[in-house]
Amino acid sequence: DNYLDPNAQLGTQIEMNQAPTGIGWNNIEARRWLVDYYKREQTTDGKNDSRLFYTLWYDGAASDFPEYPNQLIYGSPWNSDWGNRVFIKKYSTDASPLYYWNDNNFRSLRYADMLLLYAEALNELNATPPSKAIECLNRVRNRVNLPNIEDSKYYNGSQISTNKDAFREHLKIERALELAMECVRWVDLKRWGI
């Protein structure tokens, strides 16, 4: 019972809210477009973006990440009844949902968020993206082994790194991927007037 240890860490109900049907309440799900966006670009060693593995559960994840062939959702394999749905893995413990007692702390502020916000501010203050803005973006990308934006094989890196509007549009994508399910998307959309 999760309520027996008086010294347990006090967490949130995030796990129960996002756990798949039959395991939790399933109040929150991700959208398939997010999986597709993560899979657009491969890392420098030809693998899928690791943020996808740590953020979402979906049918096909085992083939997208063969280094983790026996992926479990709270101790259970993927259920074919879930079909093409996408569940949130971030903040989960891969164990039975822990209700309030969970030592996986909710991060309210992240360094990557600050880097991307700083890059966005620098871009808005200049006619073209300054080198410091590009450096901040690349630090976030390089952390997950993605190439510098200028060297991207999927995105038009030369345009993104030299055009203010293209850089802004790409930051919207990077923020969605890096900060998925971290309660910043609504604020981002409001700031961008979307």
Give names to the regions the model predicted.
Residues 1-38:
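Polar, glycine-rich mid-to-C-terminal structural blocks
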Residues 1, 42-194:
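Acidic/polar-rich alpha-helix caps and helix-coil junctions
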